[in-house]
Amino acid sequence: MRMDKLTSRFQQALADAQSLAVGRDHNIIEPVHVLAALLDQSGGSTRPLLSQSGVNVPALRERLGEALDTLPKVSGQEGNLSIGNDLNRLLNQTDKLAQQHGDAFIASEWFVLAAADDASPLGVALRAAGGDKKKIEAAIDKLRGGETVQSENAEEQRQALEKYTIDLTARAESGKLDPVIGRDEEIRRTIQVLQRRTKNNPVLIGEPGVGKTAIVEGLAQRIINGEVPEGLRGKRVLSLDMGALIAGAKFRGEFEERLKAVLSDLSKNEGQIILFIDELHTMVGAGKADGAMDAGNMLKPALARGELHCIGATTLDEYRKYIEKDAALERRFQKVFVGEPTVEDTIAILRGLKERYAVHHGVEITDPAIVAAATLSNRYITDRQLPDKAIDLMDEAASRIRMEIDSKPEELDRLERRLIQLKIQREMLKKEKDEASRQRLADLESDIDKLEREFSDLNEVWKSEKAALQGTTKIKEQIEHAKLELEAAQRRQDYAKMSEIQYGVLPQLEKQMLLANEVEHHDFKLVQDRVTAEEIAEVVSRWTGIPVNKMLEGERDKLLRMEDELHRRVVGQEEAIKVVSDAVRRSRAGLSDPNRPSGSFLFLGPTGVGKTELCKALADFLFDSTEAMIRIDMSEFMEKHSVSRLIGAPPGYVGYEEGGYLTEAVRRRPYSLILLDEVEKAHADVFNILLQVLDDGRLTDGQGRTVDFRNTVIVMTSNLGSHQIQELSGDGSAEAYTQMKAAVMGVVQAHFRPEFINRLDDIVVFHPLDKAQIKSIARIQLQGLEKRLAERGLKLDLDDPALELLGNVGFDPVYGARPLKRAIQSQVENPLAQQILSGQYTSGDTVRVRTEGGHLAFTKG
């Protein structure tokens, strides 16, 4: 017999049989070796073939193992291995059967058929396990589908649909698919296209996360429930697994062979199968090599003839990029656009899915949580689509509650740690012999006893609460399972089973659920199993950094005292602080316009009066860190071409992939303070970009992504009108301020365009600083020096006359507070540094600073 006339699978089985014989010290290869190798072959057709013909495969494998154990073993042989007479005879019989059926290559199924009525131990074992020649022959005919074996790889291509597709209708029948709520219009349109005579192939196009795959799952569920037109009843929806199709296709033509086998199996089923290709664009170019045909081109003839009933799904961008370029492929599909559902539709979808997620996590999901998931995700998570982002929110919030139930409560954990500390102390005190130690040990023992009792009581409470929650989870799972069984019985029209479930099993389970809920209605002390709107808000805050969760009392008080907090760092400038504080309070109370930034201001004033310092203080107040402020020095954007640095370079330019300086910063931290410093120095084109941000709270970057600025506070600083401010500042009265602001606005209107000024929430003019304010600033700035000295173990004691002197030296009405910093450096820091280095002060000393003859004098305190 020529080995090259065997199929590759049969050749592999013979090689495995040889290895099996060598491993067991057999010097003759028998038929049992070959069948054992065929049964153990991964992806082979022998095991499913025998199962279909009614053979008990595990029992057969066991009998083969016993037969192998009885074969004689040979030790010390020199590798002489031969084919036994029984195997030789069976192989000849296999060859004969293959020729009778017109096969060019000998397939492994003929070996199984030849063994069915053979007198060898293999035949006996096969018949004992339920093997019947006629049944095996019928199973072979069904497996081959009337085709002959004409290629070496013919066995690889069998059962292509089972290997390379996932049966969605079977999954829907077994209740493994999530329910699909709404989307009736899209499903109806898909069915309409599928009912056409030719080009009956819909392609679902929509943004990622809008539910394209869910529509096909909904169609599969409708087919199972018989809620489709006559033309689609009884059809199967199979999802093509592109990963399985491509994986392991090592040689050229292997991928095409697999795809051809799938198409061949589909055409045999004569329109009874609808093929779903998720990520349809992957078919274009798949398997493409020099001169080879890609998968998209192989599909075209089958699509055009109507042999292939297909549903595709892809995103808008990928459809444009891949499918539209291939006009011949595009015209064979009918577009069905899937839009993003509204917030109301999303709430309905979440209500339908709620039970599945509640059972999976073993928690209760409240209706306010569902409404919050839809509304908050729509408002704050702008770079993703509904309903996907809302489902993710609900899922993560439920996961968080489940994790808290499973892990030890904080109170118990704290008690346990305290107990460990006390027990360590007890062991140390046991080694001491003095009376005081014995007394402390006795006190410690009583503390440990008290804590252990408290810990034990709490632990019991936690365990009982946890057990109560787990009980309801189990009942929920049983109810879910009973409902699935009821649906299956309804489809089979098994009225006895339906009656048993509907009037027996379900009411009993619901009664148990009611009793369990009554136990749960007592407020649990340590665990919580309800997902509420607060949990959803907490997850949104963690995702985006935007504080949308319910404000704690402490935070409310902090916001009401915001002006006082800012005045600790910024001296004077009442109007500016009031305007900024009001904007933040509006935003946190949820009253600000949801389609504009939380606040947009232009700060005007001479240099050194606190414009930038107020922004730093605000960032520190909001985020507890000045690092959270996005600071952009607008003097860097004086040229026209530098505008692209803010939003990213356009396509074709260097740096296109990197994104913009402003847009990337806001995408990473959507809740932030943006400081555009020295804004008048920027090129006029920068303001064209800012118009969109100030009006709509959004900006499109160089890559076409929309960046959300609605949760930012935008502050621009400028020195415009400084001369007028110095001249007209007057006595600080309201009239003088109004007159000064009018003069400054004249300068501002001459520099900025009306459409830019009109979009700002407020223009704030800062006052020049007077001597009293400079003195207060000196006190604030010296606090930084005190901190640095404290790190070295030194204290600073500076009296009022010394502070007055510093204020006088550092006062300059033109330059504001900046000369004060230089005055502190020259008058205090420089002489103090010399004295510390010379060893005059050591750790623990106090540095006294006093005035002597118009100068500052330093003494050790």
From Swiss-Prot:
Main localization, broad class: cytoplasm
Sites where the protein binds ATP 1: 206-213
Residues that bind ATP 2: 605-612
Annotated stretches, region: Repeat 1: 6-71
Region feature NBD1, mapped onto this chain: 159-340
Assembly and oligomerization: Homohexamer. The oligomerization is ATP-dependent.
Protein name: Chaperone protein ClpB
